[in-house]
């Protein structure tokens, strides 16, 4: 079989169609496939003429009549997106310096935004009512939190051993030996630091406690007059004039999982009968060429399988500006004006059609709602770590989400996905300018969701959490290290966002959101400092002689005090604040029926195991988050390159590499405290034991085998596992199907396989006009690539080739026309583990 016959055999044609093709030359084959009989100046451009035929035979059910067009140079182009109608989306520059803004105001240059109300008198009165209620509630929260903190801090002050602050007079220390002065002051300085840190941390814990408590009462009572979900009956027809875009920004994601979830979501939308009101946009920022080709293939298959022509679109950006927020902004500028609403989906998001329809109805019923955030439920993972986290978020999460809604009402959070957004005000007010200045906290905003919610509220639009709306799902990281990688990004983003704390016009609630966002990570180094100062105080107490006389003519000594009854009372109170939300959560499950969680005994046992698991992980997260915060402030780059692995498990080597320093710290800390005072080690045991066990907990909890075993025992069971909704069952089924036909090494297939080459050529984004300099550059790219072995062609160079239809055509032609000349490429392709189902395109 010669090379021409081999090529014809690789075409997606019937035997009769193959036999009708000439076998004299490769150029003749492409000319025979070209119904339009185009002529090309170069022989290796002839595959451009057969792109349409190869696509039509490969994916006949995926193409509509007007999708294949000719670009300005007469090359076949696959229109994967509708015609753009551009809108202006211009960000306002940030003024983060309050002194500069005050000076502008003095000079009459106040640019604080003011927005006209869009509401009727009745709607304004209704809105003012809930805003007033929300303000009163938040003042109550502030009063409760501060009162509790003041009482606890006073208790803490009486517990600390050194009570002689009032007797210390700096004037008496003048001329005194410096070492004596230092030793007199040291215990009190340490105690002051401990007291300040305790107050901050206790206030943080107290706010969480009251949030969970109010969420518990909301869910227990079951009636909420301010719930946005109560504003519709639930069966109103959707307004055909207000269409919704489901947008999914992705970047180098698991293609099989992305398209499985998207297919399940779309089929659920179709089942509601409302599919005509929705379009789907897959917005790719992927820069891995293999994944890019796999995405294109999966998109074509999705369209064929759900008959999604004209409603499911795909776009890969050539310039990845501002990451995810820039991806969404680009959609809004080009196609946003065609839609009233958009629902933002993550790569792992799955939503039911009823949930999506309900979100649209809520937008229709609440004309001043700018963002409505659903409450995603975690499901779909099998590792022990993920199942434990799924159980925790499913049991505890509703309390905190309902509590957030209770305090915030329509001035709430937006989490960046599984939420519906009103497009017009988003375009007008939510464009994000880079943060001014230089350094680690300048540049493009990373945690864009909190900032977009703040800007939407600043413009007068409401931001709501539909905490009681079912049908919204997501997935969690499979293991601790993957979660920490995500936390590294979120830490940087939240620290950057805090620069906006004093920006003009921000609502106090969203200033508080910025504060809580930064405290989510800043609490870790504060907690670590609290433990370090407590340890230092114990060292001082054990190794130095107390200073009984702090004044020259003091009559009575100041004895260090130890009041264990108060210490135990304060410890118990703190434990109540930390663990009562968990108890309230399980009480709620017991009241509403524990059957879906495995029954009364198993759900209770799962709760106890989860508490133990969280105690083991808390110190580990504390140290990692401390490193993240310190590195962000010092401008250090935290490089985290994990080895490739076939599943979600953490190898033992990586576990000890990541947690080895924590294990060593735990051992040194434990031995040192045991040597000083065994009684103090008892109080410190939860910390040091967790650090010593961290590599073992991290590795074992990442095993799916252990997680599946707990699933068989009905531990950490959640309702989505006990009785999976149809959309999740469909996601699993489609994921299995996609895994069977998964495409690996997509770039090599796009070079060699006629079908995938046609697809890559038709969807290539670099549609340049002919030019002499451009031709020289193209020829250089192709020649340099073919003169090297494929493994030496790096990702960026592959992406350049993949983005140009001409270079892909020439690569394809040359490796088939002269296989002996380019044997390194041919041999590399033949050695690939080919998946016959992935190549079965017809």
From Swiss-Prot:
Cellular component terms (Gene Ontology): plasma membrane
Pathway listed: Glycan metabolism; osmoregulated periplasmic glucan (OPG) biosynthesis
GO molecular function: hexosyltransferase activity
Transmembrane parts of this sequence: 140-160, 194-214, 513-533, 568-588, 600-620, 622-642, 656-676, 680-700
Gene: mdoH
Keywords: Cell inner membrane, Cell membrane, Glycosyltransferase, Membrane, Transferase, Transmembrane, Transmembrane helix
Keyword Cell membrane found: yes
Top class in the EC scheme: transferase
Enzyme Commission code: 2.4.1.-
Annotated protein name in UniProt: Glucans biosynthesis glucosyltransferase H
Function: Involved in the biosynthesis of osmoregulated periplasmic glucans (OPGs).
Alphabetical list of Pfam families matching this protein: Glycos_transf_2 (PF00535)
Keyword hit for Transmembrane helix: yes
CDD domains tied to this protein: Glucan_BSP_MdoH
Gene3D superfamilies: Spore Coat Polysaccharide Biosynthesis Protein SpsA, Chain A
Domain of life: Bacteria
Localization per record: Cell inner membrane
Family: Belongs to the glycosyltransferase 2 family. OpgH subfamily.
Membrane topology term: Multi-pass membrane protein
BP terms from Gene Ontology: glucan biosynthetic process
């Amino acid at each position: 079989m010669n090379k021409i016959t081999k090529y014809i055999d690789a075409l997606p044609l019937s035997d009769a169609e193959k036999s009708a093709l000439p076998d004299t030359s490769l150029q003749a084959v492409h000319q025979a496939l070209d119904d339009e009989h185009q002529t090309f100046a170069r022989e290796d451009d002839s595959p451009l003429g057969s792109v349409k035929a190869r696509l039509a035979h490969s994916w006949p059910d995926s193409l509509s009549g007007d999708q294949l067009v000719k670009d300005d140079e007469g090359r076949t182009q696959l229109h994967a997106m509708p015609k753009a109608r551009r809108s202006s989306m211009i960000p306002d520059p940030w003024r983060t310096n309050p002194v500069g803004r005050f000076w502008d105001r003095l000079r009459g240059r106040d640019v604080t935004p003011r927005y006209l109300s869009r509401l009727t008198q009745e709607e304004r009165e209704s809105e003012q009512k809930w805003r007033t209620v929300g303000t009163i509630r938040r003042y109550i929260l502030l009063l409760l939190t501060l009162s509790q903190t003041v009482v606890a801090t006073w208790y803490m002050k009486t517990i600390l051993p050194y009570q002689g602050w009032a007797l210390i007079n700096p004037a008496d220390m003048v001329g005194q030996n410096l070492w004596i002065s230092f030793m007199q002051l040291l215990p009190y300085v340490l105690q002051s630091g401990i007291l300040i840190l305790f107050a901050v941390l206790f206030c943080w814990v107290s706010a969480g406690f009251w949030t969970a408590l109010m969420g518990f009462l909301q869910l227990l009572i079951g009636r909420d007059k301010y719930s946005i979900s109560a504003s519709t009956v639930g069966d109103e027809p959707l307004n055909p004039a207000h269409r919704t875009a489901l947008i999914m920004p992705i970047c180098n994601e698991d293609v099989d999982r992305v398209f499985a979830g998207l297919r399940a979501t779309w089929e659920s939308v179709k089942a509601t009968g409302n599919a005509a009101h929705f379009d789907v946009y897959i917005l790719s920022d992927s820069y891995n060429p293999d994944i890019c080709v796999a995405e294109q293939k999966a998109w074509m298959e999705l369209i064929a399988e759900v008959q999604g022509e004209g409603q499911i679109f795909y776009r890969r950006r050539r310039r990845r500006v501002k990451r995810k927020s820039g991806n969404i902004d680009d959609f809004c500028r080009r196609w946003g004006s065609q839609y009233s609403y958009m629902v933002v989906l993550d790569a792992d998001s799955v939503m039911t059609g009823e949930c999506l329809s309900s979100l649209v109805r809520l937008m229709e019923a609440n004309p001043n709602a700018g963002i409505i955030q659903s409450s995603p439920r975690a499901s779909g993972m099998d590792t022990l770590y993920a199942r434990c986290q799924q159980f925790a978020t499913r049991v505890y999460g509703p309390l905190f989400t309902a509590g957030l809604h209770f305090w915030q009402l329509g001035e709430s959070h937006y989490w960046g996905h599984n939420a519906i957004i009103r497009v017009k005000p988003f375009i007008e007010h939510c464009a994000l300018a880079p943060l001014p200045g230089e350094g680690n906290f300048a540049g493009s905003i990373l945690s864009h969701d909190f900032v977009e919610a703040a800007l939407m509220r600043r413009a007068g639009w409401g931001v709501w959490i539909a905490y009681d709306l079912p049908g919204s799902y997501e997935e969690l990281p499979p293991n601790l290290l993957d979660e920490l990688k995500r936390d590294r990004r979120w830490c940087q983003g939240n620290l950057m966002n805090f620069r906006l704390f004093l920006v003009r016009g921000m609502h106090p609630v969203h200033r508080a959101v910025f504060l809580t966002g930064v405290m989510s990570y800043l609490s870790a180094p504060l907690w670590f400092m609290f433990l370090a100062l407590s340890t230092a105080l114990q060292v001082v107490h054990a190794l130095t002689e107390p200073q009984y006389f702090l004044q020259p003519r003091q009559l009575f000594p100041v004895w260090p005090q130890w009041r264990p009854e108060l210490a135990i009372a304060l410890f118990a109170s703190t434990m109540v604040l930390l663990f009562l939300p968990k108890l309230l959560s399980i009480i709620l499950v017991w009241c509403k029926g524990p059957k879906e969680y495995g029954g009364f005994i198993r759900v209770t046992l799962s709760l106890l195991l989860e508490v133990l698991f969280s105690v083991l992980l808390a110190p580990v997260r504390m140290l990692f988050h401390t490193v993240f915060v310190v590195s962000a402030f010092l401008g250090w780059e935290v490089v985290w390159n994990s080895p490739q692995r076939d599943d979600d498990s953490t190898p033992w080597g990586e576990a000890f590499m990541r947690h080895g320093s924590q294990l060593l710290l735990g051992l040194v800390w434990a031995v040192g405290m045991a040597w000083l005072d065994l009684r103090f080690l008892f109080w410190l045991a939860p910390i040091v034991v967790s650090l010593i066990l961290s590599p073992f907990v991290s590795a074992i909890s990442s095993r799916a085998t252990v997680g599946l075993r707990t699933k068989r025992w009905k531990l950490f069971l959640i309702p989505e596992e006990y009785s999976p909704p149809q959309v999740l069952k469909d996601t699993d089924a489609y994921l299995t199907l996609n895994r069977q036909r998964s495409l690996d090494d997509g770039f090599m297939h796009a070079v060699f396989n006629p079908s995938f080459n046609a697809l890559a050529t038709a969807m290539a984004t670099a549609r340049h006009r002919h030019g002499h300099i451009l031709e020289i550059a193209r020829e250089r790219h192709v020649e340099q690539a073919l003169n090297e072995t494929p493994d030496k062609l790096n990702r960026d160079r592959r992406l350049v080739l993949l983005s140009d239809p001409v270079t892909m055509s020439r690569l394809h032609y040359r490796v088939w026309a002269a296989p002996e000349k380019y044997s390194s490429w041919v041999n590399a392709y033949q050695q690939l583990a080919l998946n016959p189902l992935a190549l079965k395109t017809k």
